[in-house]
């Protein structure tokens, strides 16, 4: 199969769809891999490394889309890419369609096959292609929250760890999944007093056993969240409903319960966000203030650490990319029900129920 890896063009997105080591696995199996010129530079991979892995370098993004049957990316296509996607082409990347009507319409119109990393789902309910970026995003959420607590950045002027004789910052994590656990562990490691809220009692029991002593668990209800807000310094929103929009757990009205300078980090912004007042931001302009509360809502948090992120992503996606290239998407999805759950749009039709429900296409 002809596999293409274009350069990501989203704001400050320095990740790339595959490492040279991943490319080498595909070319070793006889597949033709084309990489756009400088696609890997942001992640620390030169064109020469891809050539040594057996790839050929194409000069433009247009050439990659034109010549390749399967496109392996990190981010969803954005508007300049819409017209490059063609009928029958397989796109293997993150999409997050539920909060992107324009993207959904463009991919339906293109006639492409859209296989989304974020909805590939194992029988135990885990999301193997979302997990590596969730682990990165959770850790970064805690670090960014700590950074913006500085008074010079608009925060309360608190050191997350405190010092002897001075209490540490208090961190509330909404959602006890992969992102939430990673955020809680990082914040706890920095010395914060952490509370992690979830609606699953079995998950809360597991977190209670497995996380450090300065991580506490809380059943997630509106009342319990409200009671936490007056004394919290950082809130990390990490709720996930696979393939669907995220519910708003903190409303605009609830902002008044928090002290000015509190930092909200919305990791779920690519699925609509956990906070009613969230709107997408970028690495260039990551924060804004509403009602005295800082909002950090960067949709591609792992893009700030692209070398780590690209290695982690390729580790997870490669086996599926190989199956798709070896067998074609139809046979690969027939053989692997987990991969089949990644099918969101197929040649003009929405085939993932949660997305169809959002847009009334059921």
Model regions: which residues?
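Glycine/serine-rich phosphate-binding loop and adjoining beta1-alpha1 elements at the start
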Residues: 2, 8, 77-169, 298-300
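Rossmann-like adenosine-cofactor binding region
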Residues: 209-291
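Glycine-rich phosphate/diphosphate-binding loop of Rossmann-like nucleotide-binding domains
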Residues: 6-42, 152-240, 287
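Adenosine-phosphate binding glycine-rich loop
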Residues: 118-144, 148-159, 269, 274-362
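Generic hydrophobic/aromatic pocket-lining and core-packing "Φ" positions
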Residues: 23, 47, 104, 142, ...
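Short glycine-/small-residue-rich Rossmann-like dinucleotide-binding loops
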Residues: 69, 75-76, 95-96, 239-243, ...
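An N-terminal-biased, well-structured beta-alpha scaffold segment characteristic
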Residues: 2-106, 110
């Amino acid at each position: 199969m002809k596999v293409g890896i274009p350069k990501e063009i989203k704001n400050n997105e320095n990740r790339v769809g595959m490492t040279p080591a991943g490319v080498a696995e595909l070319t070793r199996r006889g597949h033709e891999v084309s990489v756009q010129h400088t696609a890997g530079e942001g992640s620390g991979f030169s064109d020469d490394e891809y050539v040594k892995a057996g790839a050929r370098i194409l000069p433009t993004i247009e050439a990659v889309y034109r010549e390749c049957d399967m496109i392996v990316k990190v981010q969803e296509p954005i508007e300049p890419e819409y017209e490059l996607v063609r009928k029958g082409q397989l796109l293997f990347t993150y999409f997050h369609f539920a909060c992107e009507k324009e993207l959904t319409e463009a991919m339906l119109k293109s006639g492409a096959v859209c296989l989304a990393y974020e909805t590939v789902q194992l029988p135990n309910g885990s999301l193997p292609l979302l997990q590596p970026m969730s682990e990165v995003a959770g850790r970064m959420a805690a670090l960014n929250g700590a950074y913006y607590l500085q008074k010079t950045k608009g925060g309360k002027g608190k050191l997350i760890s405190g010092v002897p004789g001075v209490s540490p910052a208090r961190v509330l994590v909404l959602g006890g999944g992969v992102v939430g656990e990673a955020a809680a562990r990082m914040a706890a490691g920095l010395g914060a007093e952490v509370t992690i809220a979830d609606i699953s009692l079995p998950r809360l029991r597991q977190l209670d056993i497995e996380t450090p002593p300065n991580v506490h668990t809380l059943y997630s209800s509106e009342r319990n969240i409200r009671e936490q807000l007056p004394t919290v310094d950082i809130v990390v929103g990490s709720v996930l409903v696979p393939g669907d929009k995220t519910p708003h757990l903190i409303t605009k009205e609830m902002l008044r319960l928090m002290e000015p300078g509190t930092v909200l980090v919305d990791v779920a912004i690519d699925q609509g966000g956990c906070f009613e007042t969230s709107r997408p931001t970028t690495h260039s302009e990551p924060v804004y203030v509403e009602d005295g509360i800082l909002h950090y809502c960067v949709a591609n948090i792992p893009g700030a650490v692209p070398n780590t992120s690209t290695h982690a992503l390729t580790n997870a996606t490669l086996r599926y990319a190989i199956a798709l290239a070896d067998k074609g998407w139809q046979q690969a999805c027939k053989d692997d029900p987990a991969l089949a759950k990644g099918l969101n749009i197929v040649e003009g039709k929405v085939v993932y129920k949660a997305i169809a429900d959002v847009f009334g296409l059921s």
